[in-house]
């Protein structure tokens, strides 16, 4: 049943993207954070869904999107230099095959970081991206928060939605991300327009903040605990 739910949601998301190509961008962000292909047992775990949506997002932007307000920034040029530097140091590493395998995810992440600002032309698009990223991270944070409140957790033993160290499912990374998005959650509670501020939005945002605050406790990861202390000071 879970596989059917993932497939139905992804196909609906991708289908809407053919009408509004910017939705491919949001769909890729969801896939990159939640990794539904790794949560699936058999229907989509053998399909390179991330690469497919990545390609659709770029092709959709090139073919359809309005580019009159597109601007390149110095940051994107620096990222291109970093991409070239990563490639050069990888092929010249002492163990190039192992290095290429270890950092295979970096290439797509850097290309996406260069490409993404080109698509964010309006405030609505920026807010849509923020909302999708928050809700995607919330899917992991809420699961971790509930398990921490119910059973405690422990370093390397708190299972989030996925029982392996992949992306945000690695305890140290997710605990740091959970604390880092708390200011963004509170900002959205006050200034969101897709879901305008009301008591339901406030309850969800406060509950999500509480779940995020529990993550460093449940994972017992130093990175998250340091982030929590710094956030409390600020």
Which residues fall in each region the model found?
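Transmembrane signal-anchor hairpin modules in multi-pass inner-membrane enzymes, especially those
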Residues: 1-88, 97, 101, 123-131, ...
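Flexible, active-site-adjacent loop/turn segments at secondary-structure boundaries
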Residues: 32, 37-45, 153-160, 164-167
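Alpha-helical transmembrane segments and their membrane-interface exit regions
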Residues: 34-36, 56-61, 108-114, 232-234
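Alpha-helical transmembrane segments of multi-pass inner-membrane proteins
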Residues: 8-17, 83-91, 108-112, 127-160, ...
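Non-cytosolic membrane-interface motifs at loop->transmembrane helix junctions
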Residues: 98-105, 162-164
């Amino acid at each position: 049943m879970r596989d059917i739910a993932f497939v139905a949601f992804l196909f609906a998301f991708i289908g809407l993207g053919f009408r509004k190509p910017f939705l491919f961008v949001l769909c890729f962000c969801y896939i990159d954070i939640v990794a539904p292909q790794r949560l699936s047992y058999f229907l989509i775990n053998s399909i390179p869904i991330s690469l497919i949506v990545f390609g659709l997002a770029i092709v959709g932007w090139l073919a359809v999107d309005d580019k009159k307000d597109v601007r390149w920034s110095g940051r994107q040029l620096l990222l291109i230099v970093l991409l070239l530097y990563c490639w050069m140091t990888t092929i010249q590493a002492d163990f190039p095959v192992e290095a290429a395998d270890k950092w295979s995810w970096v290439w797509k992440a850097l290309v996406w970081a260069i490409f993404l600002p080109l698509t964010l032309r309006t405030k609505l698009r920026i807010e849509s991206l923020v909302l999708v990223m928050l809700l995607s991270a919330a899917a992991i944070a809420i699961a971790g928060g509930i398990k921490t409140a119910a059973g405690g957790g422990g370093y390397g033993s708190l299972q989030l939605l996925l029982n392996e160290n992949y992306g945000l499912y690695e305890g140290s990374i997710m605990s740091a991300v959970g604390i880092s998005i708390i200011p963004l959650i509170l900002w959205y509670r006050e200034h969101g327009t897709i879901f305008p501020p009301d008591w339901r939005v406030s309850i969800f945002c406060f509950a999500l903040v509480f779940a995020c605050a529990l993550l460093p406790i449940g994972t017992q990861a130093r990175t998250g605990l340091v982030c929590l202390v710094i956030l409390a000071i600020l």
